[in-house]
Amino acid sequence: DHYDHLDHSTIKRIKDNVNIFVVPHGVGNHLRKWEVKEENIIELNWNESFEKDNIEFTCLPARHFSGRGPLNRNSTLWCSWAIKSPFVKIYFSGDSGYGKHFKKIGDEHGPFNISLLDCGQYNKAWKYSHMLPSEAVLAAKDLGTEFFMPIHWGGFTLAMHPWDEPVEESIKFADKVGLSYLT
């Protein structure tokens, strides 16, 4: 539920035009405060799924934390997502440090056609919350992805690295291991 992933003004603007908000457990409390109708909120815990119109959303583990301030740290669930249709499998990492969970997710839910992986806003001291570009590429390999898309870079300045370093480094590492990517 960090501000760079859950924006109050955006939700207020779109809430009447979105039929369903599929969110991790606890995030529904924010949505209800922002006047999203209860029947439009689906909250999931890790390894729970919701299917609508032949599209399945599965809430999966990530290595991160939640909170919109110091008083509500870890009061909602952080997660990643597998999104599957009869035609494509997509993985979205959300914010996550690198870990064994990527291999497990790949084994249980993959392989994926496209994996959108956190590669920005990193610092070696934050390795349990955000991946380095090289780790994002390792995660893509663990997931068994066909195409890797580096995400979570270039939107907000939260780390000291140069603006476009995350995507440039990710592409460099992807090329080294023969991984196809989308930018």
Q: What are the residue ranges of the model-derived segments?
A:
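Histidine-centered active-site/metal-ligand motif
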Residues: 2-5, 64, 92, 130, ...
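Short glycine-rich, flexible loops that bind phosphorylated cofactors or substrates
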Residues: 4-5, 66, 124, 157
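Helix-loop-beta element that forms the nucleotide-linked donor phosphate-binding surface
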Residues: 31-45
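Di-metal (Zn2+ and/or Mg2+/Mn2+) metal-binding site signature of metallo-dependent hydrolases
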Residues: 1-17, 25
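Cap/insert and terminal regions of metallo-dependent hydrolase folds
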Residues: 20-22, 26-29, 89, 97-183
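Core dinuclear metal-dependent hydrolase active-site scaffold
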Residues: 44-110
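Structured loop/turn residues at beta-strand edges in well-structured enzyme cores
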Residues: 16, 36-39, 55, 76, ...
